[in-house]
Amino acid sequence: MGRMKPIPWLVSILLGLSGYSISYADTLAPVSAIHISGNHFVDGSGQTIQLRGASISGLETVAVQGWDPSNPWGSQSGEATPNWKLLKNWNMNIVRLPLNEASWLGYKCADATGALRDPDPGHNYQATVKQGVAEATAAGLYVIIDLHLTAPKNFCPLAQNPMADAENSISFWKSVATTFKGYPNVLFELFNEPFMYWLATPNTEWQAAMQGGMVTQYVTGAPTPYQAAYSWKTAGMQQMLDTVRATGATNPVLIAGIQWSGDLSKWLDNAPKDSLKQIAAVWHPYPAYGTTWGTMPYTLPSGGAAAYANAQAILNAGIPVILTETGDRNAPGTVGAPFMSKLLPWADKAGVSYLGWTWDVWQNGDFVLIKDKSGTPSDGYGVYFKQHLGCVSKSPAAACP
């Protein structure tokens, strides 16, 4: 077998990172560029690819909470930094990195008590993210950079808020797109999960999510008050997309639906315009999780027949759909994954990409893929997900349960 040759753009990026070094060996994994053609993702040679992977949680919370100033990853995956080889061993080809806008931008922010805190206490957040993207790239993975936690004004992003904010989120995307536009294997997910509560404008939820609007409260992240009165302007998907494109970035951009990214019913009517035609729709299907999240209604399940039909309509219109989050039950002793065993075969047949939430060693009974730092799959969900990825990597998708 011939030895792999280094990819010129990858080598130049890795060698150019401050404080990051690699041995110059021609054994780098052959990660390719990615772009959108019709309703599929394609690689640098124009071959259709299906993205299958996982999110790694930690970067969105660890630094802003001050858990471990020395390490913004917080060892949430069981080790100080993610073991990219384990993801590849699961036959994954993509990883999603959820970020915190205050930690990336580095401005002092106020918690629910009014006390100021440093969301980048180790002054290492950007360097950590850059190194993580470089390492994942060198391991042969595509990378999604996801704006996960936001907050208006100078409030700390300590919990999910209804939408990106007009001031900080625009600055975030200008900086992030400028930083990573040289990575043709990186995709930008503009905002994790719009839920558009407390609208003060006559706009519909869809208009406010895609074009911006006014919101009258924000989520503090504290037990009391969980939410607080404050009028602020959201950043619409169109404004954030325009900000990314203004940097010269041509990377694919991922656009969520509303209601925690579970509703795609009017996505086609309201999606932002991209002259490059490099956008995809984001859907977060989950099994029933309850009716509230904190004190707010949480409209799940998001995986009913209508949800599949909405996703199919977007595909039929020539636009890709990607599940940047999904999950199933994994409490100890769980056998099988009924939600996943319906969703993933459908996605394979439709050419829809998907990522599991989450590659972390939390001992939660839902939506956790692994038990330990060795990547042992969790009961139920984790076992099924790993087995399914192994099957589709070797066999036609139609042959994989």
Where are these regions (language model features)?
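N-terminal secretory signal peptides that target proteins for export/translocation
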Residues: 1-4
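A mature extracytoplasmic/lumenal domain signature
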Residues: 55, 99-101, 147-149, 192, ...
